[in-house]
Amino acid sequence: MKEKFIALLTFTSSLKNFGIKFIRVAILVVFVWIGGLKYFHYEADGIVPFVANSPFMSFFYAKDAPEYKDHKNPEGAFVPENRAWHEANRTYTFSYGLGALIMSIGILVFLGIFFPKVALVGDTLAIIMTLGTLSFLVTTPEVWVPNLGGDEFGFPLLSGAGRLVIKDIVILAGAVVLLSDSSQRVLKTLKK
């Protein structure tokens, strides 16, 4: 039994390089998919609470934060008045730019499989982006269960939006591992 356990550990201990490449592919898939969704109105509408409440991003929008609450669309719904408001707010223009940025970061991270110097840029940007996303836990009221009369609300009870945001901590951890790997690979070439 001990021999089988040692054989299993020997195999799993050899997965580090595969795991690092797999993280790069996973980030590519998630970032290209999510970035691509930013070109659809329902997704652009959905990020408005995050952007509007962020001190780092709210300047991209034309309208003040509280106004968006009157113009929320259920996913898949088309409400002409709300669409006009989002167009005037620059919701879609910002979302298109954000989508392009997210997809570009995913591609740069993926290219790190082949080009460690490119990976340094992509990995660093992935870290910055996920830190920005995690900042929404502080800036966006919608990440916590609202007080609607029940006894379960507020911190630490994450809403659907909050549960979505908190998962970025896993991407952040992966990006830190990738940055370390890229740095080691670049250092090897510089020491030659």
Indicate where each model-derived feature is located:
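Membrane-interface extramembranous regions
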Residues: 1-192
